[in-house]
Design a protein with these regions (language model features):
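Aromatic-Pro/Gly-enriched surface loop or interdomain linker
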Residues: 1-47
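Short catalytic/ligand-binding loop motif for oxyanion handling, primarily in non-cytosolic enzymes
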Residues: 14-15, 59-60, 93-96, 166-170, ...
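Hydrophobic/aromatic beta-strand patches that form the interior of the parallel beta-sheet core
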Residues: 32, 85, 100, 159, ...
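Conserved acidic residues
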Residues: 45-50, 190
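Structural motif
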Residues: 49-55, 175-179
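A glycine-rich, often tryptophan-bearing local segment used as a flexible ligand/cofactor-contacting loop or short
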Residues: 57-58, 62-130
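Catalytic beta-strand/loop cores that center a nucleophilic Ser/Cys/Thr
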Residues: 119-174, 179-188
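Acyltransferase
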Residues: 187-196
Length: 196
């Protein structure tokens, strides 16, 4: 069974997101939770994949607990065959301002796109189309979208798109990132009764 090292640091990483990922991944993977007090080199040496959940972590909080050596360690891990999984906040952290594990693409706020149907950063539901053609409603809380940056993009597979057709979930090499919350549990929706 492969090992996923799931980062957790409350409140930047939502406990609900972390627990949702553990619930979703545990039947298929060995999930080990790690935090800023752990030795990252050791964590990565024992893992097949490093994962980052959703939460409220912005650039300020990221730089409070991740130094350049941490970013380099994550990037080297991915370059040497390790996998990266990022959901919502973890999707943003794959981008050029953070771990920089994407090639020729970046992550920006979906709600800032001119044709986005969601315009505010609150809990709601996004209608997403999966790569196999069907659509589903998925929990959304200020998730990202994939856009080109100034470098030539390397190929990536679009696994799901937002209602406006922009990529919501992709796989590029060893990196898988998701803007919405497929790990969401039913009680999340109880916190936002207006989306029922």
């Amino acid at each position: 069974m492969k090992t996923i090292a799931l980062f957790s640091h409350h409140p930047e990483c939502s406990n609900e997101c972390t627990l949702g990922m553990i619930t979703a991944l545990s039947p298929h993977y060995r999930v080990r939770v790690w935090g800023i007090a752990d030795n990252l080199d050791y964590v990565l040496s024992q893992s097949d994949c490093v994962a980052f959940p959703g939460g409220i972590g912005d650039s300020d909080s990221y730089y409070e607990f991740f130094k350049r050596r941490h970013g380099n360690a994550i990037a080297n891990f991915v370059d040497n065959g390790g996998k990266y999984l990022g959901i919502c906040m973890g999707q943003y952290w794959a981008g050029s301002h953070y771990f920089d594990v994407l090639k020729g693409i970046d992550v920006v706020q979906y709600i800032k796109q001119p044709d986005a149907e969601i315009k505010r950063s609150y809990g709601t539901v996004a209608k997403v189309t999966m790569d196999y053609g069907s659509w589903k409603n998925m929990f959304f809380y200020d998730g990202g979208v994939i856009v080109p940056n100034n470098d030539p993009p390397e190929p990536y597979k679009v696994k799901a798109t937002y209602q406006n057709g922009m990529p919501m979930a992709i796989i590029q090499g060893n990196v898988g990132i998701i803007g919405c919350h497929p790990e969401s549990e039913m009680f999340w929706y109880d916190l936002y009764p207006y989306i029922r």
